[in-house]
UniProtKB/Swiss-Prot annotation:
Family, similarity comment: Belongs to the YajQ family.
Keywords annotated in UniProt: Nucleotide-binding
Known role: Nucleotide-binding protein.
Protein name, entry field: Nucleotide-binding protein Mpe_A3039
């Protein structure tokens, strides 16, 4: 039976490259001279440091631009963390790199496929959703449906089997 997996996986090598490029640009930009603005990557956490909220937003813009240039969707970053004050006027923000579909989104995909009355089944498997069907055309229609209705996360499809 043909099947595919719906996953949420960023290219971590490109994320690291974007962070490195952002660090270089921050180091050479005139408006950041003498400031403690920087970007660090540890595991799947990107930490932004700056002297003020305004500079932090500039650092975030630089990082987003570099991610976009490296073909990494900025929606992979979970920027819901609040800005923390660290000594004096300095601030930091920790961004998590999303990897794996959370259970809420997986259930949404599963219910979407069931409600569409297509001849495919969706099964949640850890941090991925496997969609199986009798025909390849049904699977392609399911992919189009998922892309159209689940736009808040950058989903990708892999492991397509015939």
């Amino acid at each position: 039976m043909p099947s595919f997996d719906t996953v949420l996986e960023p290219n971590l090598v490109e994320v690291r490259n974007a962070v490195d490029q952002s660090s270089k640009e921050i180091g050479t930009r005139f408006d950041f001279k003498g400031s403690s603005a920087r970007v660090e990557l540890k595991d799947k956490d990107i930490t932004l440091y700056a002297d003020s909220d305004f500079q932090l937003s500039q650092v975030m813009d630089i990082l987003t631009l570099k991610l976009t240039k490296r073909s990494v969707d900025a929606r992979f970053l979970d920027s819901s963390a609040k800005i923390e004050k660290i000594g004096g006027d300095k601030v930091k923000q920790v961004l998590k790199v999303k990897e794996g579909i959370d259970s809420e989104t997986a259930k949404k995909i599963q219910q979407l496929i069931k409600a569409s009355k297509m001849k495919v089944q969706a099964a949640i498997q850890g941090d991925a959703v496997r969609v199986t069907g009798a025909k390849r055309d049904d699977l392609q229609a399911a992919m189009a449906l998922i892309r159209k209705d689940v736009a808040d996360v950058p989903l990708s499809f892999n492991n397509f089997r015939d």
